[in-house]
Amino acid sequence: MTHSNIVGGSSAKRLIKCPGSRKLVAELPPKPSSSYAEEGSRLHDAMHMILSHGARVDDYTDNEKLILALDALNEIDPNNELEFATEVNVHFGGFLAGVFGSCDLAGRIRNRAILLDWKFGDGVSVAAEENEQLMFY
C-alpha cells in the first residue's frame, strides 16, 4: 500500500504553512529510503496484520515495540469498544486536491474519534502534541 502522496511526517509542517509547495515537491525526485523508514514500515505492517488479521505478536522479531504500541492502544480502549480500520487513506478534499496520507488506525469509541499513527521511536523524534501530520487527519 502506498502510505502517502506528498503528505508524510516530514512534509506536513511545510504543507500547512505553504499549501502551494506541493506542486514543487511533486517535481522533485523521490527521497531514498532509510533503515529507520524501512524498520518503521515493517512495524506498521506488523501492527496491521495483528489488528486486522489476527497475527500473533510472537511471530515478529521486533515484538517489544509492537507490545508497547498494543499496550498504548489498550490504554485508549481498555474495554475493547473500539470500532476501527487499519491503514486508512485520508484525503484532504479541496484543500489539497489529489493529496492523501495514511493513518495506521482510524476508529471510534461511541462518539469519540480515534486516529493513530504509530511512531516507534527510532531516527527522528516525533512529538504527539501539535503534530502536523495528525493535524491533517
Write out the residue ranges for each language-model feature:
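A non-catalytic, helix-rich entry segment at domain boundaries
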Residues: 31-94
